[in-house]
Curated annotation (Swiss-Prot):
Binds directly to 16S ribosomal RNA. It is found in: Plastid, Cyanelle. NCBIfam families: S20. GO terms for cellular component: cyanelle; cytosol; small ribosomal subunit. The keyword Membrane does not apply. One of its GO terms (biological process) is translation. Belongs to the bacterial ribosomal protein bS20 family. Keywords: Cyanelle, Plastid, Ribonucleoprotein, Ribosomal protein, RNA-binding, rRNA-binding. Pfam families: Ribosomal_S20p. This is Small ribosomal subunit protein bS20c. Disulfide bonds: none annotated. It comes from the Eukaryota.
Amino acid sequence: MANTKSAIKRIKTIERNRIRNCAYKSVVKTFIKKYLKVLSDYTNAPNSNGVENIQTTLGIVYTKIDKAVKRGVYHSNKAARMKSKLALKYNVIKK
């Protein structure tokens, strides 16, 4: 246990930030799962508006990832890797 007042405050701050970071990560993971679901639905039954749904969902996922980077939840290189993997899946489907 912390002995000084500043160390006690620091523990509270760290715990608050940890919970916040977990929430941001959860949101990003949720939207990635939604994107992958849209992709799988399109591969099972291709239709004209499926591509539009994929593109809009991909844009939303990119936004969520970028906001997580801005808030310091993810490193920019990790975000770039995540976005690259998602774009690769889209490009494979598009061909």
